[in-house]
């Protein structure tokens, strides 16, 4: 049952305080009406005796405490969902912005999702091919995983996100794959880039886009990822689709969280962020996964820009605790002109072992990835040594490692923006690069794998 009040006592930032209320609950949806008849939406952030704190999604600009009325609807925030959302673009709170008609909903779902019994979760398995060698070969994405991308200001994470959204597929199940893309706090230029990228390549047909712009109220950023995940859950668990959710930029989301926390005059935690930020991020990241008895899955790739490239900053730090690895973009590789500038050494996919190997990618994949990692690490270490003693002091084997490291970056990590490599191409390229090294140095690969996949022996057998 809805209740209407005109007893607003204070408006500050994105918040308003309504006094003299009764029976108001946390999370309840609020409809706000101005003197001119304009309507806005909000949500109850805090409900105390005779008082409610409301966050206004469209912002509090031009609202007057004397002439504004507030109606408490008695419902939680719900998003209308339908299969017709595929191929559509929405703003941060779910309104169409692509010129198309309003969505006729098949259902309305709570944006906070349904609680998922941990026992009902199925373990993430099955390889997702992104077409990017540094991810597929070295830090494999697995269906049901949450694997963030740690980037920095000015690095090409937007291009990487668009490329993954365009190319990602579960092998053998392309027809049931969908992408839900949510952008928070992006500029008009970035929004146009994403629209153009999805529309020109045809990827929009299997995608749902939510775009929250930088000049939209910060409070919208709190809702946008939850809207996206609610749609993803609907596609995955009602229609058995394999859904990849890309969230960018989670740093903007956390800044909005800090802004609202400051407006509520809460005691700040590390660097001014609220003490509950870990819990809040978990309510987003933990909505990835698979459910026993359901064919569909939700895989998450949140993207965040690390302030000052600091991986110990609270946002990447807390994200790392919740998620299952990280893909780290390197400013040094970016300066070398390498795209995508993925640094495979600090990058990690904790579930990689469960999504690769015989029957999933190829039998040599686990050993090949370990050998490539070890050889590249050795080559990087020798670069530092060369800076001190010079290349003349190195052995012939050491020089081979240096050559390997250079070619690994130029040929394996680097690839074109429209280059979509299959997993076979990625693994074969890895073996081609390992052929630079003496066979005696391939200590992490079994002899039978060398005999079967090493270019020297494959050429003989063919």
From Swiss-Prot:
Protein source organism: Pyrococcus abyssi (strain GE5 / Orsay)
Protein name per its UniProtKB record: A-type ATP synthase subunit B
One protein family per Pfam: ATP-synt_ab
HAMAP family in the record: ATP_synth_B_arch
GO cellular component: a single term: plasma membrane
Principal subcellular localisation of the protein: membrane
Biological function: Component of the A-type ATP synthase that produces ATP from ADP in the presence of a proton gradient across the membrane. The B chain is a regulatory subunit.
Bilayer topology annotation: Peripheral membrane protein
Localization, UniProt: Cell membrane
Gene encoding the protein: atpB
Record key words, sorted: ATP synthesis, Cell membrane, Hydrogen ion transport, Ion transport, Membrane, Transport
Keyword Nuclease carried by entry: no
Subunit text: Has multiple subunits with at least A(3), B(3), C, D, E, F, H, I and proteolipid K(x).
PANTHER family for this protein: V-TYPE PROTON ATPASE SUBUNIT B
Superkingdom of origin organism: Archaea
A single BP term in Gene Ontology: proton motive force-driven plasma membrane ATP synthesis
Lineage, top ranks: Archaea, Methanobacteriati, Methanobacteriota, Thermococci, Thermococcales
Gene Ontology MF: a single term: ATP binding
Family as reported in the entry's similarity comment: Belongs to the ATPase alpha/beta chains family.
NCBIfam families: ATP_syn_B_arch (TIGR01041), PRK04196.1 (NF003235)
Entry keyword Membrane: yes
């Amino acid at each position: 049952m809805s209740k209407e009040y005109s007893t607003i006592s204070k408006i500050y930032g994105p918040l308003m305080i309504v006094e003299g209320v009764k029976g108001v609950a946390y999370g309840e949806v609020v409809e706000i009406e101005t003197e001119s008849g304009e309507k806005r939406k909000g949500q109850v952030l805090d409900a105390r005796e005779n008082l409610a704190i409301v966050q206004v999604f469209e912002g509090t600009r031009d609202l007057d405490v004397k002439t504004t009325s507030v109606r408490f609807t008695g419902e939680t925030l719900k998003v209308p969902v339908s299969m017709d959302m595929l191929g559509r673009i929405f703003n941060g709170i779910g309104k169409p912005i692509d010129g198309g008609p309003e969505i006729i909903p098949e259902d309305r779902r709570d944006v906070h999702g349904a609680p998922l019994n941990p026992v009902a979760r199925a373990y993430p398995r099955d390889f997702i091919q992104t077409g990017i060698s540094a991810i597929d070969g070295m830090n494999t994405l697995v269906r049901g995983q949450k694997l963030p991308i740690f980037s920095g200001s000015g690095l090409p994470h937007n291009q990487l996100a668009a490329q993954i959204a365009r190319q990602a597929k579960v092998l053998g199940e392309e027809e049931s794959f969908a992408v839900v893309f949510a952008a928070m706090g992006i500029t008009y230029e970035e929004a146009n880039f994403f629209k153009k990228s999805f529309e020109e390549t045809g990827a929009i047909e299997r995608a749902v886009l939510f775009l929250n712009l930088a000049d939209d109220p910060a409070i919208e950023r709190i809702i946008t990822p939850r809207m996206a995940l609610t749609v993803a859950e609907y596609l995955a668990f009602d229609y058995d689709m394999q859904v990849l959710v890309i969230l960018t930029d989670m740093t903007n989301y956390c800044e909005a969280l800090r802004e609202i926390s400051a407006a509520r005059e809460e005691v700040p935690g590390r660097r001014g962020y609220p003490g509950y930020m870990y819990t809040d991020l978990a309510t987003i990241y933990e909505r990835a996964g698979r459910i026993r008895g359901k064919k569909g899955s939700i895989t998450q790739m949140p993207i965040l820009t690390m302030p000052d490239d600091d991986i110990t900053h609270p946002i990447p730090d807390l994200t790392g605790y919740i998620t299952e690895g990280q893909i780290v973009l390197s400013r040094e590789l970016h300066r070398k002109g390498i795209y995508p500038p993925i640094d495979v050494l600090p990058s990690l996919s904790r579930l990689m072992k469960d999504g690769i190997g015989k029957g999933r990618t190829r039998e040599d994949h686990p050993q090949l990835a370990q050998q490539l990692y070890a050889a590249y690490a050795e080559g990087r270490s020798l670069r530092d040594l060369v800076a001190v003693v010079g290349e003349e002091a190195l052995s012939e084997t050491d020089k081979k490692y240096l050559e390997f490291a250079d070619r690994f970056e130029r040929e394996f990590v680097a690839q074109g923006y429209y280059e979509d490599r299959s997993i076979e191409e990625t693994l074969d390229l890895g073996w081609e690069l390992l052929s630079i090294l003496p066979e005696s140095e391939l200590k992490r690969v079994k002899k039978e794998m060398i005999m079967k996949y090493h270019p020297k022996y494959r050429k003989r057998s063919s």
